[in-house]
Amino acid sequence: MTNLEDRLQQPMTGDDSFLYHYTSLSSACKIFESNSLKLSNLTNTNDPLDFFSPENCGFSSCGDIDYKKVFYELRLSGQKRRNYVRMLCFCKDLFCTSEEWKNEKNQDFADNLLFKGWARSRMWAQYADNHSGACLVFYKSEFQKAFKSLSNDDVEILSDRAINYTNYLAELETSLEDINSGARVIYDYSSFYLEEDKKKFLFQKCQDYRDENEYRFCLINRALNSPDEAMFVNYGTSLKAVILGQRFSTSLNLATPDNVEQFKIMWTFGRPSLLKIK
């Protein structure tokens, strides 16, 4: 085994160095050609917490306000949120505490490697062309540096983190609905949905998505004028391996970069393993 191959198959109490990005074969080819990943916008995500338009949900207030002005500015703020916010989504490995490790079921779970970010069968089905695409393995600390390099006067980098999965939505609703929250009086609501106390909700999803075990990078780019305006990040040398799906056609030759290792995932009685190709 290579050092990387060994690390990718370590027990679940070990390495937190890698992030995993599932993609189709056609998208993988574009990624390798450009050495970059395309950031997603909010409108094309699957979770309603991301793609919903908060300005259409109304607001609560007290005192005398100019409703026409507030409605206009909240709509403008909602459009800014859709235009400016970009993200990249990865899977990460699951880990057990030393106490959890004593559980016999957890030890069996570790033996079959289903805790690994590259071994999520539903992700292979949904995002990697039903097991015929690829899973890209990035070194986390190197990709963090690449992502932070996007920062400039227009681009605000939000701290990358694991997604918080919860069905408790009262805090989100209050934050986005109460225009007088925080015992403050503001007169310009045109950036209301991008204020500091609301940014943490860009890292929140409903519990129905918890099996994705997502790790998200997010930024606000105020130079963008449309949700469809493309933005990319050059990942430098952070791509360390490409894992091909079990249904990846043997007649195809995926041209991966020379310094990137290549594996194929194999499923035996539902247990995943890696076969070194390059």
Please give the residue ranges for each predicted region.
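Partner-binding and oligomerization surfaces adjacent to conserved cores of proteins
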Residues: 1-278
